């Protein structure tokens, strides 16, 4: 997918990886970049507008833990204004295994709810034009960081959901792929809590190993958007972009 002249909704587009990715996206010249985030950041929005004044950058406050009905209501405002949306990026995430319910609500249920809401506008069974979804998951969806099992499981769930969305594309007209960053230098990983304090130094220990910058991750994210491969499981780690082959151990047969 060429980003130029497209209408893009980016949930959590002002976060660590999110903001750098938003910067790279506006450089590629979309028609509209609509950022949905929990906390407004006027300085960041102004910066994005300045990077490419030809791009219309707008912000709406949004908490992914709201109901599908509330999400649909906000999306209707956006669709009424833009008429069409080409790409939805679901990027909300928290890393704090003290907050069990919120971790699941943000990292998994939030992705499901926002995706479910946009189907009201995209699903070809309802006369919609289809669309593309990029879900930010994590390499912990492949193999857990076992000291943060709640976070890791929430990302594995989001990855499984995304893989199913891709298989449903012939029915819905909506394609999907996952973005799975490795350990990236953002505020998310500088300090966080392990489950039941099983490893108080988990953040410190992780950062002793090779990481990548959020800019490296963002640049590869844009490459994945441009590749636009339905069902792709992209690993963005150590500054590299790699498509993962998923091993099938069981099949429902339906």
From Swiss-Prot:
InterPro entries: ADH_Drosophila-type (IPR002425), NAD(P)-bd_dom_sf (IPR036291), Sc_DH/Rdtase_CS (IPR020904), SDR_fam (IPR002347). Substrate binds at residue 138. GO terms for cellular component: cytoplasm. Pfam families: adh_short. It is an enzyme of class 1 (oxidoreductase). PROSITE patterns: ADH_SHORT. It catalyses: a primary alcohol + NAD(+) = an aldehyde + NADH + H(+); a secondary alcohol + NAD(+) = a ketone + NADH + H(+). SUPFAM superfamilies: NAD(P)-binding Rossmann-fold domains. GO terms for molecular function: alcohol dehydrogenase (NAD+) activity. The keyword Translocase does not apply. GO terms for biological process: alcohol metabolic process. NAD(+) binds at residues 10-33. The active site is at 151 (proton acceptor). Keywords: NAD, Oxidoreductase. Its EC number is 1.1.1.1. Homodimer. Belongs to the short-chain dehydrogenases/reductases (SDR) family. This is Alcohol dehydrogenase 1. It comes from Drosophila hydei (Fruit fly).
């Amino acid at each position: 997918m060429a980003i130029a002249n497209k209408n893009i909704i980016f949930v959590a587009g002002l976060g660590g990886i999110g903001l750098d990715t938003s910067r790279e996206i506006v450089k590629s010249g979309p028609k509209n970049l609509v950022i949905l985030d929990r906390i407004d950041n006027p300085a960041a929005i102004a910066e994005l507008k300045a990077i490419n004044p030809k791009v219309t950058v707008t912000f709406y406050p949004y908490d992914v833990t709201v109901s599908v009905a509330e999400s649909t209501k906000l999306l209707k405002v956006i669709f009424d204004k833009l008429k069409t949306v080409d790409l939805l990026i679901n990027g909300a995430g928290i890393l704090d295994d003290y907050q069990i319910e919120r971790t699941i609500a943000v990292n998994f249920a939030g992705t499901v709810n926002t995706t479910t809401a946009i189907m009201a506008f995209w699903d070809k069974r309802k006369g919609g034009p289809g669309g593309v979804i990029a879900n930010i998951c994590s390499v912990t969806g492949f193999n857990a960081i076992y000291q943060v099992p709640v976070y890791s499981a929430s990302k594995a769930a989001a990855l499984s959901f995304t893989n199913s969305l891709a298989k449903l594309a012939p029915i819905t007209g909506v394609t999907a792929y996952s973005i799975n960053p490795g350990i990236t230098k953002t505020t998310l990983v500088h300090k966080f809590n392990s489950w039941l304090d099983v490893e108080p130094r988990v953040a410190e220990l992780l950062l002793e190993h090779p990481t990548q910058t959020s800019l490296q991750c963002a640049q590869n994210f844009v490459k994945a958007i441009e590749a636009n491969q339905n069902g792709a499981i992209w690993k963005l780690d150590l500054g590299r972009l790699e498509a993962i082959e998923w091993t099938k151990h069981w099949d429902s047969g339906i």
